[in-house]
């Protein structure tokens, strides 16, 4: 089974339990918090992702470190993932769970990259256009990347809209090469 499919199955199982218990938002917040701490802690990564560390020790560490912050459902789910030796799928599971939660709430996550910081007016206008385009509420994360030279790169879920000057120059270069060859 491919990596994405494994993560999707585990995420769907956790989502079903969270939905049945009316705890989708809480479970999502717990997963986001757990993953944020996991991303920030090299020590925790080295323990959880190391196949030489016994599963029981991993579970004990998770219970000790997160037992007070996580609900029983989320904590038990993480222990199940560890029991099944699926810890390498944790990020994918969290991402799939968040996507399922967003789909339920008619929300789409977007990432907008610009060469310069966008003004508040530009951000509001962009949000309105993207919301009309998708028919969904948006959660947009903005980032600045001077390498794109100008324009925007917008990621909406699985779709990427590359309106950057860098991409336009690449297309022009490819077009010139094809003309010379042909």
Curated annotation (Swiss-Prot):
<keyword id="KW-0472">Membrane</keyword>
<keyword id="KW-1003">Cell membrane</keyword>
<comment type="function">
    <text>This protein is part of the stalk that links CF(0) to CF(1). It either transmits conformational changes from CF(0) to CF(1) or is implicated in proton conduction.</text>
</comment>
<dbReference type="GO" id="GO:0005886">
    <property type="term" value="C:plasma membrane"/>
</dbReference>
<comment type="similarity">
    <text>Belongs to the ATPase delta chain family.</text>
</comment>
<dbReference type="GO" id="GO:0046933">
    <property type="term" value="F:proton-transporting ATP synthase activity, rotational mechanism"/>
</dbReference>
<comment type="subunit">
    <text>F-type ATPases have 2 components, F(1) - the catalytic core - and F(0) - the membrane proton channel. F(1) has five subunits: alpha(3), beta(3), gamma(1), delta(1), epsilon(1). F(0) has three main subunits: a(1), b(2) and c(10-14). The alpha and beta chains form an alternating ring which encloses part of the gamma chain. F(1) is attached to F(0) by a central stalk formed by the gamma and epsilon chains, while a peripheral stalk is formed by the delta and b chains.</text>
</comment>
<comment type="function">
    <text>F(1)F(0) ATP synthase produces ATP from ADP in the presence of a proton or sodium gradient. F-type ATPases consist of two structural domains, F(1) containing the extramembraneous catalytic core and F(0) containing the membrane proton channel, linked together by a central stalk and a peripheral stalk. During catalysis, ATP synthesis in the catalytic domain of F(1) is coupled via a rotary mechanism of the central stalk subunits to proton translocation.</text>
</comment>
<dbReference type="InterPro" id="IPR000711">
    <property type="entry name" value="ATPase_OSCP/dsu"/>
</dbReference>
<keyword id="KW-0375">Hydrogen ion transport</keyword>
<keyword id="KW-0066">ATP synthesis</keyword>
<dbReference type="InterPro" id="IPR026015">
    <property type="entry name" value="ATP_synth_OSCP/delta_N_sf"/>
</dbReference>
<keyword id="KW-0813">Transport</keyword>
<dbReference type="InterPro" id="IPR020781">
    <property type="entry name" value="ATPase_OSCP/d_CS"/>
</dbReference>
<keyword id="KW-0139">CF(1)</keyword>
<dbReference type="Pfam" id="PF00213">
    <property type="entry name" value="OSCP"/>
</dbReference>
<dbReference type="GO" id="GO:0045259">
    <property type="term" value="C:proton-transporting ATP synthase complex"/>
</dbReference>
<protein>
    <recommendedName>
        <fullName>ATP synthase subunit delta</fullName>
    </recommendedName>
</protein>
<keyword id="KW-0406">Ion transport</keyword>
């Amino acid at each position: 089974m491919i990596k994405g499919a494994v993560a999707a199955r585990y995420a769907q199982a956790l989502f079903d339990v969270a939905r049945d218990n009316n705890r989708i938002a809480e479970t999502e917040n717990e997963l986001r918090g757990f993953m944020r701490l996991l991303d920030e802690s090299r020590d925790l990564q080295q323990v959880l992702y190391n196949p030489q560390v016994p599963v029981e020790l991993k579970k004990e560490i998770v219970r000790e470190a997160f037992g007070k912050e996580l609900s029983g459902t989320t904590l038990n789910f993480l222990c199940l993932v560890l029991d099944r030796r699926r810890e390498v799928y944790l990020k994918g599971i969290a991402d799939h769970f968040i996507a399922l939660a967003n789909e339920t709430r008619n929300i789409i996550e977007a990432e907008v990259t610009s060469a310069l910081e966008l003004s508040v007016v530009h951000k509001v206008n962009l949000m309105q256009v993207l919301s009309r385009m998708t028919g969904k509420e948006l959660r947009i994360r903005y980032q600045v990347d001077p390498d794109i030279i100008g324009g925007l790169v917008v990621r909406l879920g699985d779709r990427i809209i590359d309106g950057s000057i860098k991409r336009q120059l690449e297309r022009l270069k490819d077009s010139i090469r094809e003309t010379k060859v042909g």
